[in-house]
Curated annotation (Swiss-Prot):
Keywords: Ribonucleoprotein, Ribosomal protein
Lineage: Bacteria, Pseudomonadati, Campylobacterota, Epsilonproteobacteria, Nautiliales
Gene, per the UniProt record: rpsI
InterPro entries: Ribosomal_Su5_D2-typ_SF, Ribosomal_uS9, Ribosomal_uS9_bac/plastid, Ribosomal_uS9_CS, Ribsml_uS5_D2-typ_fold_subgr
Key word Transmembrane helix present: no
Name of the protein: Small ribosomal subunit protein uS9
Length: 129
């Protein structure tokens, strides 16, 4: 196994992911996962979920770069990218990841603002008289 590449997306965030055989190190934007996410334990668990489900957390190294969005969206994009890369590495892992929805791109994005409204749906206050 050389380097396996995949991209993950969520909202406006994009994660480019490379998997290599290794000891389980996760590097994001040149920092370790703990440095990158600081005290956000829930986000760290979310990123590690595909590796934990496939029991690969000790056998592959993850190198990733993320662009756009916030930390939560970037973490979800990273999770999606890792899942896709694991499937590219071994197609048998698809049956483990698919039931958990890790291979599905979350299509929810911000609804656009409409004219005549304050936000996407918030209308100006209505006065009867």
């Amino acid at each position: 196994m050389s380097r396996i590449y995949a991209t993950g997306k969520r909202k406006t965030a994009v994660a480019k992911v490379w998997l290599t055989k290794g000891s389980g190190k996760i590097t994001v934007n040149g920092m370790s996962l703990d440095e990158w996410l600081g005290g956000h334990e829930a986000l760290k668990l979310r990123v590690r979920l595909p590796l934990a489900l496939t029991k690969m957390s000790e056998s592959v190294d993850v190198v990733a770069t993320t662009l756009g969005g916030g930390y939560s969206a970037q973490a979800d994009a990273l999770k999606h990218g890792i899942s896709k890369a694991l499937c590219a590495m071994d197609d048998n892992l698809r049956s483990v990841l698919k039931p958990h929805g890790l291979l599905t791109r979350d299509a929810r994005v911000v609804e656009r603002k409409k004219y005549g409204k304050h936000k996407a749906r918030r209308s100006p206050q209505f006065s009867k008289r």
